[in-house]
């Protein structure tokens, strides 16, 4: 199926948390592949955000009272609806975000897997647990979890379903409400996921989508929420962290990256070259965890460069709403300008183009070829700065030591990839990298898809984690309840205070030696 109809967009628009839609100024949403208008979206205001929070707080109080099992069942129904509507969701992702269909399918798979994981584990994670008390048998200590309240989510355009719905699901299961600002370029992807959540039984006031500019809607969300989740640039993340810090609320963010791949002797270069095309050019390189630097041992660098260049040149660009295309479009003129600027700057300063290197307006207005450079030096803009597009540079290195040193020579630390002669060798190299996730024998998907493990960045690549238990519990306040069941620390009846105080330390030391105490 091609571009969604105007009736579909009209239906989704009715779900936006804006009361007087027809009276608002609007922003045009284009089909990325062609540049032709698809529809419009009303521009939200700070007042819309405040109204959404007022309704969300009322809805959240009732939602939090429902058993975790009931909340999880809503998410299971949502999961099933995603599967039923997968073709429509992929169509919308392609139209609004310009993805190749296989890249759109990655998002749909993530929606299903994420919802399934948190629906399955949430009851166990949120169940109050007994922990070691001060005095065994005499005291009892339990840890419980209360929802934060209303969570704010500010999501980006590059993965507009994964990074809206999949960040919201654990917050909702934990008993929170969510007020979300989608990126202004991809609001209907967020609304489509919201529609499925509502159909699954989620109260509408509990999950509010407020489209609008970040400077207005995003700021208002940051100023009203009880916890803030953000995905975007490191610069914007820093400003939001400062704002959250002034309010003393929790903050989590996945930010930029300049992700490295290491290739050592003994690998199957044909296999690595093929895998590297996906690692570098998924979603036209507009992926926070995609690879932009490849460090290859000198002995195999020429052969790898040739094989990788051949693989990249064979990639098919296109606008088809099917699986015949390898790479889709950039999303905006701004992204196209950044990629073109980085390539032009590098080649003007001596970099060599192995593959790609130019825009492709014959395919679509925002297409750029997947590009591979060599001879890149630090005075070139693309050497240290994130491109966030279909551009990767190859660097020959003397050995693994140099590869690790250069891979770690960055402010970022989001994702990395290692291809070594053996899996144990690859895992040893991985453990030395300053990166929140490292994939061995894979570019990014295994770490991202390991939903029971935390995902996030080191350095300026992020704060906090999504996925795993951390991705759910961050949306809660832990509460310790300690009960003195026999006596407390006051002297027992008939025991002089002086004698009691002298006895306390020996008692504690004895308790420390009991089995199971550490």
UniProtKB/Swiss-Prot annotation:
This is Putative succinate-semialdehyde dehydrogenase [NADP(+)] 2. The active site is at 254 (proton acceptor), 288 (nucleophile). Pfam families: Aldedh (PF00171). Its EC number is 1.2.1.79. PANTHER family: ALDEHYDE DEHYDROGENASE-RELATED. InterPro entries: Ald_DH/histidinol_DH, Ald_DH_C, Ald_DH_CS_GLU, Ald_DH_N, Aldehyde_DH_dom. It catalyses: succinate semialdehyde + NADP(+) + H2O = succinate + NADPH + 2 H(+). It is an enzyme of class 1 (oxidoreductase). Belongs to the aldehyde dehydrogenase family. It comes from the Bacteria. The keyword Oxidoreductase applies. NADP(+) binds at residues 157-158, 181-184, 232-233, 255, 386. Catalyzes the NADP(+)-dependent oxidation of succinate semialdehyde to succinate. Although it has succinate semialdehyde dehydrogenase activity, is likely to act physiologically on a different aldehyde(s). NCBIfam families: PRK09407.1. Keywords: NADP, Oxidoreductase. One of its GO terms (molecular function) is succinate-semialdehyde dehydrogenase (NADP+) activity.
């Amino acid at each position: 199926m091609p571009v969604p109809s105007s009736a579909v967009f009209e239906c989704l628009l009715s779900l936006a948390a804006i009361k007087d839609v027809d009276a608002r100024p609007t922003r045009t949403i284009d089909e990325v592949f062609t540049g032709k208008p698809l529809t419009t979206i009303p521009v939200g205001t700070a007042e819309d955000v405040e109204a959404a929070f007022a309704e969300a707080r009322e809805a959240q109080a009732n939602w939090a009272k429902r058993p975790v099992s009931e909340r999880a069942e809503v998410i299971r129904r949502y999961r099933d609806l995603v599967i039923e509507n997968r073709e429509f969701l992929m169509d919308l992702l392609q139209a609004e975000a310009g993805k190749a269909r296989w890249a759109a399918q990655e998002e749909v798979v993530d929606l299903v897997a994420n919802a399934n994981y948190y629906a399955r584990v949430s009851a166990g994670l949120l169940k109050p647990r007994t922990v070691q008390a001060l005095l065994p048998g005499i005291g009892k200590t339990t840890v419980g979890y209360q929802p934060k309240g209303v969570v704010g989510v500010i999501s980006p355009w590059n993965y507009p379903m994964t990074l809206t719905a999949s960040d919201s699901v654990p917050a909702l299961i934990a008993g929170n409400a969510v007020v979300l600002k989608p990126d202004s370029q991809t609001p209907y992807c967020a609304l489509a996921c919201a529609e499925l959540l509502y159909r699954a039984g989620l109260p509408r006031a509990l999950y509010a989508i407020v489209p609008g500019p970040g400077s207005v809607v995003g700021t208002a969300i940051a100023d009203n929420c009880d916890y803030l989740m953000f995905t975007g640039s490191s610069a914007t993340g820093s400003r939001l962290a400062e704002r959250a810090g002034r309010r003393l609320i929790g903050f989590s963010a996945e930010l930029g990256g300049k992700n490295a791949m290491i290739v050592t002797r003994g690998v199957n270069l044909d296999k690595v070259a093929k895998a590297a095309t996906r690692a570098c050019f998924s979603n036209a390189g507009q992926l926070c965890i995609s690879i932009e630097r490849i460090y290859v041992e000198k002995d195999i660098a020429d052969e790898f460069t040739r094989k990788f260049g051949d693989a990249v040149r064979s990639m098919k660009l296109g606008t088809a709403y099917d699986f015949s295309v390898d790479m889709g479009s950039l999303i905006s003129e701004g992204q196209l300008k950044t990629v073109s600027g980085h390539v032009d700057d590098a080649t003007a300063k001596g970099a060599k183009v192995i593959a790609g290197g130019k825009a492709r307006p014959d395919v679509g207005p925002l297409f750029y070829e997947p590009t591979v450079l060599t001879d890149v030096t630090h005075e070139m803009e693309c050497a240290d700065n994130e491109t966030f597009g279909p551009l990767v540079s190859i660097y020959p290195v003397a050995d693994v030591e140099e590869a690790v040193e250069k891979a770690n020579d960055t402010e970022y630390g989001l994702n990395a990839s290692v291809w070594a002669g053996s899996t144990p060798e690859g895992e040893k190299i991985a453990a030395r990298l300053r990166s929140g996730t490292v994939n061995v024998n894979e570019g990014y998907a295994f770490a991202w898809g390991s939903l029971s493990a935390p995902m996030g960045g080191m350095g300026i690549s992020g704060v906090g984690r999504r996925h795993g238990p951390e991705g759910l519990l961050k949306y809660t306040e832990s509460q310790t309840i300690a009960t003195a069941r026999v006596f407390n620390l006051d002297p027992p009846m008939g025991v002089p205070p002086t004698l009691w105080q002298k006895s306390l330390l020996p008692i504690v030391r004895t308790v420390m030696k009991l089995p199971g105490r550490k």
